Design a protein with these regions (language model features):
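Sec-dependent N-terminal signal peptides
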Residues: 1-16
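Beta-loop motif signature
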Residues: 20-86, 114-153
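Surface-exposed flexible segments
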Residues: 59, 107-111, 173-175
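SH3/SH3-like beta-barrel superfamily modules
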Residues: 70-106, 142-174
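Mature extracytoplasmic/lumenal regions of exported proteins
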Residues: 94, 100-123
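Residue patterns forming the tRNA-binding/recognition surfaces of aminoacyl-tRNA synthetases
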Residues: 177-179
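Short, solvent-exposed mixed-charge patches
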Residues: 184-185
Length: 185
């Protein structure tokens, strides 16, 4: 009995571990035009019970009860795209991080799983007055709002180029993303 319990605990470790932020899931509710009024992304708790549904509604904002833009990596309302940190379970299910919790993503609607770094390198970032940028030696305080393309990403930091200097900005703290900074170009 103890041996069976130990095996079950070891097999479930990837699901109950802190997880990684090396992948993101990009959910498309609109692709040129709305995918359809029945475009549904279902989020299940790890025990299989329903957590929430993200639905496309023809001509309107997507509907969901418990998921808001602060629970995702990014939300692009003009394009109707949600982005979540994700990982694959040992049974090949896609798990997405909604806030601080992992949920099972179940859908027949289009979505893409990408390495987080590849996703970030396709974006611009908005830097605001008072933001702190770092290089090898200095801290630089942003004096006016600027938008720069992301040229590198490592962990919680992304790099931008300003006046031929590679400067780093902290875009997230662990799984908490600084909202409304990542811009889809």
């Amino acid at each position: 009995m103890k041996k069976t319990l130990l095996i079950l605990i070891i097999l479930s470790l990837p699901l109950i571990s802190k997880g990684s932020d090396n992948l993101v899931a990009v959910l498309y509710l609109k692709n040129g035009s709305y995918v359809s009024s029945d475009s549904v992304y279902t989020f299940l708790n790890l025990d299989g019970t329903l957590f929430d549904e993200l639905r496309s509604r023809n001509g309107n904002e997507p509907t969901c009860l418990k998921i808001d833009r602060d629970n995702s990596v990014s939300y692009y309302p003009d394009l109707m795209i949600y982005v979540f940190f994700c990982k694959l379970s040992p049974t090949r299910k896609v798990l997405v991080r909604v806030g601080h919790d992992w949920k099972i993503l179940k859908t027949n609607s289009p979505f893409t799983v990408l390495p987080t770094k590849r996703y970030l390198l396709s974006l611009d970032i908005q830097l605001r007055v008072g933001d702190i940028l770092y290089d090898k030696r200095d801290k630089v305080k942003v004096k006016r709002c600027i938008i720069r393309h992301i040229i590198d990403a490592r962990g919680d930091y992304v790099a931008v180029e300003i006046k031929k200097r590679k400067l780093w900005f902290r875009w997230k703290r662990h799984y908490q993303v600084i909202p409304d900074r990542l811009l889809y170009n």
